[in-house]
Amino acid sequence: DEVNEALRACVDHGIYGYVRPSASCLQAAASWQQRRHGFQAKPEWITVTPGIDCAMATAVQAFTDPEDKILINTPIYDPFFEVIEKNDRVIVDSPMVLTNGRYEFDWADFEVKIRGCRMWMFCNPQNPEGRCFTEEELRKAGEICGKYGVWMLSDEIHGDIVYDGRKHIPLASLSEEFCGRTITCTSPSKTFSVAGTA
């Protein structure tokens, strides 16, 4: 009902352009991260975009330069390819390894290929597989990225949709160092089934 009421208020207002989010909107987003995931995001850290792909493209443009290399781990959400290539960046793939029905990082390959990259882009929970990465995996990836001065872009749009006692851990929540080098992309669109209403 709250979503429908908010949409009606927007329609009644009659202005359909992009608007600057209110302070209460940014505070609500930060508070949600704290309550749901224990991540103490600050409202002033939040930048609102029209969608997750736009958020990723904006981060790629802000934190890398044309011809910079960006590491991904396939299989991955298909728009990652487009975001990287349409912004004239270079894809470096460190494929995940299917082990006992579960995709895992190939750490040796990851560390070799991250050298010379400017950014690592990944999904957590992983899309298309849906697996939540463990704290150990996230820490290891974050430490490797830190060793080589690599920005980390974490697409966490499915972070609120986890089942069977699993827990979503935001990468940026694990340390101040990780927080300072992580761009977290999230959205209410999956959690509340409101895609296309931005």
Stretch-by-stretch model annotation:
Residues 97-166:
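Active-site phosphate-binding strand-loop segment of PLP-dependent enzymes
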Residues 174-198:
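Active-site PLP attachment segment
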Residues 62-84:
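Conserved PLP-anchoring active-site segment centered on the Schiff-base-forming lysine
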Residues 80, 141, 171:
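Aromatic/hydrophobic pocket-lining residues that form π-stacking "cages" and hydrophobic walls in ligand
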